[in-house]
Amino acid sequence: MARSYAERANTHQSPVARRLFALMEQKQSNLCASVDVRTTKELLELLDKLGPFICLAKTHIDIIDDFTYDGTILPLLELSKKHKFLIFEDRKFADIGNTVKHQYQGGVYKIAQWADITNAHGVIGSGIVKGLKEAATETTDQPRGLLMLAELSSKGSIAHGKYTEETVEIAKSDKEFVIGFIAQNSMGGQDEGFDWIIMTPGVGLDDTGDALGQQYRTVSQVFSTGTDIIIVGRGLFGKGRDPLKEGERYRKAGWEAYQNILR
C-alpha cells in the first residue's frame, strides 16, 4: 500500500526528505524541473515561471557559461524561497571519497553550500557516501541529502541488474544522508526500515525519445512502477512550449497519478 507524502513527511529519517515531502503536499506537486540551460538569465527566468508548479529544481550548474556565485546562486536561492522549492544539483559524483569531498565543498561552484540535494554513482563503493557527507557537515549546518544513481533512462544504460543491486547496498550505509535514488522502479527497502525517495527522469506526456538515446515513459507508467517525483526538462520549456502552461499540465498529471496509486 502506497503511503502519502504527508505521512512520509512526518516519519522520514532525513530532514531534507521531510521538508521535501511537506512541500510536495503543500503545493500538490511531485514535479522536478530539469533546467539545462546555458545562461544565468535563462535559468532564473525559467525557474521564476516554473517555480509555482514544482517541488524541486534540478540544475547542471557547470553548463552555465556566465556562472558566478553571487550572480547565479544567490538569486537562485531567493527564487527557491519565493516559490518554495528545493534545489537538486545533478552533479553525478563518481570518484574516491577524498576527491568528491573537495568537488562537493570547494572549487568554483561550492555545491554543498547551496544545493539541498545532489547525487552520485555507485561504481566507487560506499566511500563516496562518506566523503560527500563529511563535506556537507563541514560546509553547512543546513541539512543535505544524497541520491544514488540506480537506474537511468537512456538507451543502452548499463545501470541495471547487479550494478543496481550493489548501488542499493551502498545506499544502506547511511539512512539519514542517502534519501533515495534516481531510478525507473521502486528499490524496495521498506521491510528494513528505509523510505527511499524515487526520482524518475525520462518522463514525457508527448514525446517517446530523442536522437541522443533518451527514452520517455508516461507519468502514469512511472508511478505504477514506484516513482515519487517525476523529472521533466524539455517537456516543460522545449521549442514552442509555454513553461506556464506545461508546468501546470505536468504538475496536474503527476498529482493525479500519485492520487491514483493511493486509492
Curated annotation (Swiss-Prot):
PROSITE patterns found in the cross-reference section: OMPDECASE
Substrates-to-products reaction catalysed: orotidine 5'-phosphate + H(+) = UMP + CO2
Sites where the protein binds substrate: 36, 58-60, 90-99, 216, 234
Sorted UniProt keywords: Decarboxylase, Lyase, Pyrimidine biosynthesis
Residue numbers annotated as active site: K92
Family to which this protein belongs: Belongs to the OMP decarboxylase family.
Name of this chain's protein: Orotidine 5'-phosphate decarboxylase
Source organism: Komagataella pastoris (Yeast)
Taxonomic lineage: Eukaryota, Fungi, Dikarya, Ascomycota, Saccharomycotina
Originating gene: URA3
